Amino acid sequence: MAVPFRRTSKTRKRLRRTHFKLNVPGMNECPNCGEMKLSHRVCKSCGHYNGKEVTSK
């Protein structure tokens, strides 16, 4: 069975883990009410999407 030849150093381990991070969601300002909303989704506060009212609040 294969075993590691050398112990992985703290630096190598941390450099490898720099890519294991969460991304910030893309937030935009709603053109209708000005609240922050996720891109390509209906605004939670006013119910508008793409300039049209999709849901009634």
From Swiss-Prot:
GO CC annotation: large ribosomal subunit
Pfam families: Ribosomal_L32p
GO terms, biological process: translation
Taxonomy, superkingdom: Bacteria
The keyword Ribonucleoprotein is annotated on this UniProt entry: yes
MF annotations from Gene Ontology: structural constituent of ribosome
Keywords tagged on the record: Ribonucleoprotein, Ribosomal protein
Family: Belongs to the bacterial ribosomal protein bL32 family.
PANTHER family: 50S RIBOSOMAL PROTEIN L32 (PTHR35534), LARGE RIBOSOMAL SUBUNIT PROTEIN BL32 (PTHR35534:SF2)
Cross-referenced NCBIfam families: rpmF_bact (TIGR01031)
Protein name in the entry: Large ribosomal subunit protein bL32
Species annotation: Exiguobacterium sp. (strain ATCC BAA-1283 / AT1b)
